[in-house]
Amino acid sequence: MINVRPAIALDAASMARLLNAIILQGGTTALTTEVSGADLLERMHANDGRATWYVAVNAAEEVVGFQWIDSADYLPPEAAEIATFVQVGQTGLGIGSKLFDATRAAAKALGYKWINANIRADNEGGLIYYQSRGFQDYGRIEGYEMANGQIVDKVLKRYDL
């Protein structure tokens, strides 16, 4: 059974382990450098009151996914940026759907009007996930250079609240 709840400081190390496994696997995130729990904790607390973080946990309270929304300098104030990460080997089990139910409600409560997702064009699973949640394509970034020098295209998707 998967439960979703707001992320707390004690989740940061587990979230970092989950994210680092995704980064090491490659191919789905634009992140290329491993993160620490302290890095994520800093990001969780560095918001302007317009961010929210949720974790999905199994029956043993182990983090199996997490999602956040936050404002972003490149977006208008009524838009939030979203990021979703599910444990390697656990995709397609409804974890992302449960996370988005909580995140969507929080985004509305925070006053956002729409949510932006930047997805690598070669991340088929991510594209399918956001499409299945009702996100619509609205743009594309060609030739995005990631921190490791790799060049990818990004699909921009939008969810109107």
What are these regions (language model features)?
Residues 116-120, 131, 136-153:
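Conserved catalytic-core motifs of GNAT/GCN5-like acyltransferases
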Residues 14, 81, 125:
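Amphipathic alpha-helical recognition patches that constitute DNA-binding helices
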Residues 84, 148-161:
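Terminal substrate-recognition subdomain of acyl/acetyltransferases
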Residues 15, 19, 40:
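Hydrophobic pocket/interface hotspot
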Residues 107-119:
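Conserved GNAT acetyl-CoA-binding A-motif
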Residues 3-15:
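A short beta-loop-alpha structural element at the N-terminal edge
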Residues 6-9, 28, 32-89, 100-102, ...:
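Acetyl-CoA-dependent GNAT
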Residues 92-109, 128-132:
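Conserved acetyl-CoA-binding loop-helix of GNAT-fold acetyltransferases
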